[in-house]
C-alpha cells in the first residue's frame, strides 16, 4: 500500500489527478516492461513469461487514469510497435542495465524510436533497470552506450515551453526492489498534458 500511496501522492502533487494518458512501455525482451506494469498495477512481483502479444492495462491511481501498452520486446513483437504510436502521450523505454552485451541492440531500437516523426514531440522516460544486480551499468555508462550523454533535458522541473525540445531523461531503477522508477514517473508526469 505504501507504493500506491507514494506514487499517488507524487502524481497528485503535480496536478495529474484528473489527467488521462496513453503510455507505451517499450524496450528489448527481458528488460522488465511487464514486471513494471504489474508492479504499478498490483504492487506485486510475479514471474512472467516473455510477452508474446501486445497487452494493455488501465491503471487508476486515485483519479489518474493511464492506459499502458506493453508491446513485448522480442524481434517479432518490435514490428508492431509503430501500430501504437497514434495519440501516444509518453514512451517508457526500459533497458536491462545488467545485459551490457545488448546495449548496441537497445541503442538501435531507441534511435529508431527517437527518429520516428510520429514520436517527434513525445516525452521519453528511459529506465535503466536491474541496478540491484552486481556489475550492472551505471547511469553514466548507460547514457554513453545509448548515445545520450549530451541529449537529455535534465531531471528536475525543466520548462521547455515552445522550444521544440523533446523531453528525454534517463533514470536508473530496480523494479524488483521498488526503487528509482517513481522518480522517473514523477519527471515524466510534468510533460503529460
Curated annotation (Swiss-Prot):
It catalyses: GTP + H2O = GDP + phosphate + H(+). Mg(2+) binds at residues 29, 70. SUPFAM superfamilies: P-loop containing nucleoside triphosphate hydrolases. The keyword Repressor does not apply. Keywords: Endoplasmic reticulum, ER-Golgi transport, Golgi apparatus, GTP-binding, Hydrolase, Magnesium, Membrane, Metal-binding, Nucleotide-binding, Protein transport, Transport. It is a peripheral membrane protein. GDP binds at residues 30-35, 53, 129-130, 132, 175. Residues 10-14 are annotated as: Mediates recruitment to ER membranes. This is Small COPII coat GTPase SAR1B.
Amino acid at each position: 500500500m505504501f507504493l500506491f500511496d507514494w506514487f499517488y501522492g507524487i502524481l497528485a502533487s503535480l496536478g495529474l489527478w484528473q489527467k488521462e494518458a496513453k503510455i507505451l512501455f517499450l524496450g528489448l525482451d527481458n528488460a522488465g516492461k511487464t514486471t513494471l506494469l504489474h508492479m504499478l498495477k498490483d504492487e506485486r512481483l510475479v514471474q512472467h513469461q516473455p510477452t508474446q502479444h501486445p497487452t494493455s492495462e488501465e491503471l487508476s491511481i486515485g483519479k489518474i487514469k493511464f492506459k499502458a501498452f506493453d508491446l513485448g520486446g522480442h524481434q517479432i513483437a518490435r514490428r508492431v510497435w509503430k501500430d501504437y504510436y497514434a495519440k501516444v502521450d509518453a514512451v517508457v523505454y526500459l533497458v536491462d542495465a545488467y545485459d551490457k552485451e545488448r546495449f548496441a541492440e537497445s541503442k538501435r531500437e531507441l534511435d529508431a524510436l527517437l527518429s520516428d516523426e510520429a514520436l517527434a514531440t513525445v516525452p521519453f522516460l528511459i529506465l535503466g533497470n536491474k541496478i540491484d544486480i552486481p556489475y550492472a551499468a551505471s547511469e553514466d555508462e548507460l547514457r554513453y552506450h545509448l548515445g545520450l550523454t549530451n541529449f537529455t533535458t535534465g531531471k528536475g522541473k525543466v520548462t521547455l515551453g515552445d522550444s521544440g525540445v523533446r523531453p528525454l531523461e534517463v533514470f536508473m531503477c530496480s523494479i524488483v526492489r521498488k526503487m528509482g522508477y517513481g522518480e522517473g514517473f514523477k519527471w515524466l508526469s510534468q510533460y503529460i498534458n
